Curated annotation (Swiss-Prot):
CDD domains: Cyt_c_Oxidase_III
Record family assignment: Belongs to the cytochrome c oxidase subunit 3 family.
Biological classification of the source: Eukaryota, Fungi, Dikarya, Ascomycota, Saccharomycotina
A Pfam family hit: COX3
InterPro entries, alphabetized: Cyt_c/ubiquinol_Oxase_su3, Cyt_c_oxase_su3_dom, Cyt_c_oxidase-like_su3, Cyt_c_oxidase_su3-like_sf, Cyt_c_oxidase_su3_a-hlx
Biological role: Component of the cytochrome c oxidase, the last enzyme in the mitochondrial electron transport chain which drives oxidative phosphorylation. The respiratory chain contains 3 multisubunit complexes succinate dehydrogenase (complex II, CII), ubiquinol-cytochrome c oxidoreductase (cytochrome b-c1 complex, complex III, CIII) and cytochrome c oxidase (complex IV, CIV), that cooperate to transfer electrons derived from NADH and succinate to molecular oxygen, creating an electrochemical gradient over the inner membrane that drives transmembrane transport and the ATP synthase.
Main localization (coarse): mitochondrion
Subcellular location: Mitochondrion inner membrane
Self-association and partners: Component of the cytochrome c oxidase (complex IV, CIV), a multisubunit enzyme composed of a catalytic core of 3 subunits and several supernumerary subunits. The complex exists as a monomer or a dimer and forms supercomplexes (SCs) in the inner mitochondrial membrane with ubiquinol-cytochrome c oxidoreductase (cytochrome b-c1 complex, complex III, CIII).
Origin species: Yarrowia lipolytica (strain CLIB 122 / E 150) (Yeast)
Protein name: Cytochrome c oxidase subunit 3
Length: 268
C-alpha cells in the first residue's frame, strides 16, 4: 500500500477514481453488435464500420488495462482484500458465461431430441452433411488439451519460482491456442453447410464461433500475462491477473470438450 493510502485510508478497499473507459468500451461493443447485425441483414454492404468499432473497442480496453496494471503494480491499490474481491468477481463472471453456453446447448438439444417435420423428422436435418468427430475436430481437441496441460505446467513453475519454465509453458500455450484458431478457420472454410442452413447451422456456428471468440480473448489475456511476467511485474505470490487468465482458459477448455461431444459426436 502506498504512503498516501496509509496516511488517509483506514480500510483495505480500492476506491476507484472516475474513468472514461467503461462507458467508451460499452459504446464500442454496442457499435460492434449493431454494425454486425446491420451487415448480416443487408443494411450495410461492407465491413468497414464493424472493423472500425472493433479497433476502437480494442484500443479503449488496452488503455483500461493499462490503468488497472498501474494501480496493481505501481500504486499499491490491490491489497489482499481487493485481490479477494477480484477473484470472487471473476468467478461470478465465469458462472455467467457458463449459463450463456448452457443456453446454446439447450437450443441444440431442443431441436436435436425432437426434430420437427420441417427438419424432415431427423437430426441432422435433411440435406445437411454434418462434420464428424474425426480429423480437424479431434485435432482441435488434442490441441486444447495440450494447451491446458502446458498452461498448468507454467502456473506451477511460477509458484515454484522457475521463471524460464513459466515463460516457456506460457509461450507453448499461446502457440497451441493460435494453432487451434487456424484449424477452426480451416474447418469453417471447408464446411459443407453455412450459418444460414436452418437451426443446425445456426446453433453449430453460434456455439463454436462463440467458443472461438473466447479462445481469442484467452489468447489476449495470456499474452498480457506473458508480457507482465517477462517484465517482472508478476511474482510467485502476487499474480491475480495470471490466475484469472488460467481460470478463464481452463473453463473454455472444458466447454470445448462438451461442444466436441455434443456437436461433433452425439449430434451427428
Amino acid at each position: 500500500m502506498n504512503l498516501t493510502l496509509k496516511k488517509f485510508q483506514v480500510h483495505p478497499f480500492h476506491l476507484v477514481a472516475p474513468s472514461p473507459w467503461p462507458i467508451l468500451v460499452s459504446f464500442s461493443v454496442m457499435s460492434i453488435m449493431l454494425t454486425l447485425v446491420f451487415n448480416m441483414h443487408g443494411f450495410m454492404h461492407n465491413n468497414y464500420w464493424v472493423v472500425f468499432s472493433a479497433i476502437v473497442a480494442i484500443m479503449t480496453m488496452a488503455l483500461w488495462f493499462r490503468d488497472i496494471i498501474s494501480e496493481a503494480t505501481y500504486l499499491g491499490d490491490h491489497t489482499l482484500a481487493v485481490r479477494k474481491g477480484l477473484n470472487i468477481g471473476f468467478i461470478l463472471f465465469v458462472v455467467s458465461e457458463l449459463f450463456f453456453f448452457i443456453a446454446i446447448f439447450w437450443a441444440f438439444f431442443h431441436s436435436a431430441m425432437a426434430p420437427t417435420i420441417e427438419l424432415g423428422g431427423v437430426w441432422p436435418p435433411v440435406g445437411i452433411e454434418a462434420i464428424g468427430p474425426s480429423e480437424l475436430p479431434l485435432l482441435n481437441t488434442i490441441l486444447l488439451l495440450c494447451s491446458g496441460a502446458t498452461l498448468t505446467w507454467s502456473h506451477h513453475a511460477l509458484l515454484g519460482g522457475n521463471r524460464f519454465n513459466t515463460l516457456l509453458g506460457l509461450i507453448l500455450t499461446i502457440a497451441l491456442a493460435v494453432t487451434f484458431m487456424i484449424c477452426q478457420y480451416m474447418e469453417y472454410s471447408n464446411a459443407p453447410f453455412t450459418i444460414s442452413d436452418g437451426i443446425f447451422g445456426s446453433v453449430f456456428y453460434f456455439g463454436t464461433g462463440f467458443h472461438g471468440l473466447h479462445i481469442i480473448i484467452g489468447i489476449i489475456m495470456l499474452g498480457v500475462s506473458l508480457w507482465r511476467i517477462y517484465t517482472y511485474q508478476l511474482t510467485n505470490n502476487h499474480h491475480v491477473g495470471y490466475e484469472t487468465s488460467i481460470l478463464y482458459y481452463h473453463f473454455v477448455d472444458v466447454v470445448w470438450l462438451f461442444l466436441y461431444i455434443v456437436f461433433y459426436w452425439w449430434g451427428t
